[in-house]
């Protein structure tokens, strides 16, 4: 936050004047006890060895260097050498001016400095409609991209279309089975096929287009025709569902293009040249144990079939060839065992996996309705589609709920609770805070009550504890965006918004606004709340959630 950056600059300058470099392990953070000020730092303890002074002595010299700064209300030495710093009310009041000036741009940063990041997410096989688990991954990925862009990174989002594997063959076979069933042919139910009702219209399409001709073709050819149609229709449905969910992908990347372009063979040759792949027992292996994996991994099975990992190696090699500095993979939590081998893959490609690869795991969603959990299984056709959930609760509620917890934590999604218009509903709680402020301005206009323009003189009236608490929280928003970007954690924005909305609701109940006692005080409080509403709107935009003026 601005306060942290200012304090760091002041301390760094004071240390530099004593010939001391900034200590690496220095912390600047709010103290546990608010009575100790706004920020506390251990800089004197971290720098005492370099300064050749006891920590408290160095802290005292730093205190004296900072004491004259007009933005600081107090600087105190505490304990073994901590510095406790409090800023003036005028400093915090200035935040309202910052928000008013920046508007929709409040919270936009340049910490990314244009670093190129690719975020690949959802990437569900086009074998059926997106389910609610995919929806959570979609919300996390899209919101992360928004956060990274807000922080100054250059971001490209991508959907990897698994169109060349076994699951696609099963889809084709499933459609052909339903086709034969609908046409009246005697059939035996396959052991492994997609049982969802969505397969039946696809089979009917085959009847409408081909009549009984598929029965006259070789099974493999008929299956392939069914597969191609199913893939095309299901992928179109996926794109529509994501569009309705306000999720955008810049690139749709088919796995089949890797094979067609020879990218898999090129990756294999690179691994061979580096002595990181070998033939054994009729199969082709990647020496992933050389990079800490628990065993080497098969790339090509003895029967000649590529493993998923083979395509993933080629795909990630392609990502880095496209010039991305960092690639982010967002996977379901059931892929956690896949992370070590993917890091080994990135290492084999000559990149540092800790710097170049970020894997975000998204845990399961337990969907509740009527107090009971809904059982889901894609293969069995028992699942709640993302489209159904969005239709029932809306994109706003669904996105906010998906981002209401860390992505690697299980999430209970109560369809009934999220539709309630009550303060117990976190989506309503935050959106209503924004609408509440807009309602105050509408009422002021109805009453003919003028609202003075934002100015330091007007904001100087904001001196109560409630005023300052709200101002300090407002000032933390850019820091929240920075933290969410640096840690790839968009849920931090959700947490912040709930905190800010809570402070606003409490402020509203304790402090009269339109009837504040004087026109200037009413205007000052309205300008403060206007800044809060603007910040809520900006934060909700990062989550892909609307900020309605009326509710």
From Swiss-Prot:
Annotated coiled-coil segments of the chain: none
Family matches, as InterPro entries: aa-tRNA-synth_I_CS, Arg-tRNA-ligase, Arg-tRNA-synth_N, Arg-tRNA-synth_N_sf, ArgRS_core, DALR_anticod-bd, Rossmann-like_a/b/a_fold, tRNAsynth_Ia_anticodon-bd
Motif ('HIGH' region): 124-134
SUPFAM superfamilies, per the entry: Anticodon-binding domain of a subclass of class I aminoacyl-tRNA synthetases, Arginyl-tRNA synthetase (ArgRS), N-terminal 'additional' domain, Nucleotidylyl transferase
Designated name of the protein: Arginine--tRNA ligase
Top class in the EC scheme: ligase
GO biological process, one term: arginyl-tRNA aminoacylation
EC id: 6.1.1.19
Family, similarity comment: Belongs to the class-I aminoacyl-tRNA synthetase family.
Keywords assigned by UniProt, alphabetized: Aminoacyl-tRNA synthetase, ATP-binding, Cytoplasm, Ligase, Nucleotide-binding, Protein biosynthesis
Signal sequence interval, chain numbering: none
Any one Pfam family match given in the protein's UniProt record, by short name: Arg_tRNA_synt_N
Gene, per the UniProt record: argS
PANTHER family according to UniProt: ARGININE--TRNA LIGASE, CYTOPLASMIC, ARGINYL-TRNA SYNTHETASE
GO CC, alphabetical: cytoplasm
Subcellular location: Cytoplasm
Substrates-to-products reaction catalysed: tRNA(Arg) + L-arginine + ATP = L-arginyl-tRNA(Arg) + AMP + diphosphate
Assembly and binders: Monomer.
Main location: cytoplasm
Biological source species: Solidesulfovibrio magneticus (strain ATCC 700980 / DSM 13731 / RS-1) (Desulfovibrio magneticus)
MF GO annotations: arginine-tRNA ligase activity; ATP binding
């Amino acid at each position: 936050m601005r306060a942290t950056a200012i304090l760091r600059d002041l301390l760094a300058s004071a240390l530099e004047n004593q010939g001391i470099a900034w200590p690496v392990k220095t912390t600047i953070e709010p103290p546990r006890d608010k009575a100790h000020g706004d920020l506390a730092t251990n800089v004197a303890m971290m720098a005492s060895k370099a300064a050749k002074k006891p920590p408290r002595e160095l802290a005292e010299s730093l205190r004296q260097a900072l004491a004259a700064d007009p933005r600081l209300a107090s600087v105190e030495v505490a304990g073994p050498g901590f510095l406790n710093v409090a800023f003036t009310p005028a400093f915090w009041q200035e935040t309202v001016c910052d928000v008013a000036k920046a508007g929709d741009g409040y919270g936009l940063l340049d910490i990314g400095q244009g670093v190129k990041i690719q975020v690949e997410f959802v990437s569900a096989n086009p074998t059926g409609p997106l389910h609610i688990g995919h929806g959570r991954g979609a919300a996390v990925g899209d919101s992360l991209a928004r956060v990274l862009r807000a922080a100054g990174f250059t971001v490209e989002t991508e959907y990897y279309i698994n169109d060349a594997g076994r699951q696609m063959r099963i889809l084709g076979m499933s459609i052909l089975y339903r086709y034969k069933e609908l046409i009246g042919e005697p059939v035996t139910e396959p052991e492994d096929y997609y049982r969802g009702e969505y397969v039946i219209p696809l089979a009917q399409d085959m009847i409408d287009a081909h009549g009984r001709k598929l029965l006259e073709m070789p099974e493999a050819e008929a299956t392939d025709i069914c597969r191609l149609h199913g893939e095309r229709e299901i992928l179109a449905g996926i794109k529509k569902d994501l569009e309705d969910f306000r999720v955008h992908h810049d690139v749709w990347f088919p796995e089949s293009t890797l094979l067609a372009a020879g990218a898999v063979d090129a990756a294999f040759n690179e691994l061979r040249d580096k002595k990181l792949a070998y033939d054994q027992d009729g199969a082709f292996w990647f020496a992933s144990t050389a990079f800490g994996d628990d065993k080497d991994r098969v790339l090509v099975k003895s029967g000649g079939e590529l493993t998923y990992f083979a395509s993933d190696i080629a795909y990630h090699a392609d990502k880095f060839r496209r010039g991305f500095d960092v690639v982010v993979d967002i996977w379901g939590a059931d892929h956690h065992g896949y992370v070590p081998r993917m890091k080994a893959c990135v290492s084999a490609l000559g990149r540092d996996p800790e710097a170049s690869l970020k894997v975000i795991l998204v845990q399961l969603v337990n969907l509740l309705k009527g107090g009971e959990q809904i059982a889901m299984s894609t293969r069995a056709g028992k699942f709640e589609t993302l489209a159904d959930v969005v239709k029932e609760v809306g994109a706003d509620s669904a996105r906010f709920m998906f981002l209401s917890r860390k992505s690697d934590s299980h999430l209970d999604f109560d369809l009934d609770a999220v539709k309630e218009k009550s303060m117990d509903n976190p989506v309503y709680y935050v959106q209503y805070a924004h609408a509440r402020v807009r309602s105050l301005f509408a009422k002021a206009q109805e009453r003919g009550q003028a609202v003075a323009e934002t100015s330091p003189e007007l904001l100087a009236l904001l001196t109560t504890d409630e005023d300052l608490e709200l101002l300090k929280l407002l000032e933390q928003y850019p820091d929240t965006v920075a933290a969410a970007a640096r840690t790839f954690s968009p849920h931090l924005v959700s947490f912040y918004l709930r905190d800010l909305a809570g402070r606003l609701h409490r402020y509203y109940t304790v402090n009269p606004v339109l009837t504040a006692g004087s026109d200037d005080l009413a205007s000052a409080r309205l300008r403060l709340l206007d800044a809060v509403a603007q910040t809520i709107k900006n934060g909700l935009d990062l989550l892909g959630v609307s900020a309605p003026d009326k509710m």
